[in-house]
C-alpha cells in the first residue's frame, strides 16, 4: 500500500490569485540534484518511474488540452544565445542547455466541440528530433497508471507507460527519441506539471502521484 501519495490540483496556474484566462501549468519539482548534491551522468543510465492516478472522466476539468505532465530536466552541450559585454550584444556559442522532455496526459473534451460525442484522452510525447510533440497511446481506462522515462549513454530518451501498478516491461515501451535533436549528457531532476484553464473558477483535474523512484544502472560513487 501507499506510504505517501500526493494529490495535486491547482486553480491559479499562472500568477497566484490573478486569473489570466489562458492555460498555464504549475510545476512540482523533485530536485534530485540537490538531494544527491550532483547531477546524474547519462553513463549511469538513469530512469525515473512514477505511479499516477487518473480520476473518473466525469471529474476532469471540462477543457481540451494538457492536464498532467511527467518530465525530466536534462542537460546537453549545444549552441545557445548569450548576452556579451556592456551593451549586452547577443551572439551564439557553445554552452550548457537545459531541456525538459516527457509525457503529457492530453484530454479532448466533448464539452469543447459540437461534433465530438465522446471524451478522449491520450499520452502526448515531448518530443521528436525537431522539437515537436506527437501523439502516443490512447488512454482507454482511468485509475492507476505507471509511467517511466529512461536515458541511455548515447543520450537517447526512452518512454514507457502502462495502466496499473505493475513494474514496467518491454511491452510498455512507447518510443525512443533525441528530443530537439539533443543528445542528453546529464539528468538534473524530474517533475510533474498540473495544467488548468487559469480562469479563477474551475480547479484543474485532480491527479494523485505515488511511489516515484530514480534508478541508476551503473551509479557512480555513493549508492542512492
Where are these regions (language model features)?
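Localized edge beta-strand/strand-to-loop motifs within extracellular or lumenal beta-rich domains
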Residues: 140-164
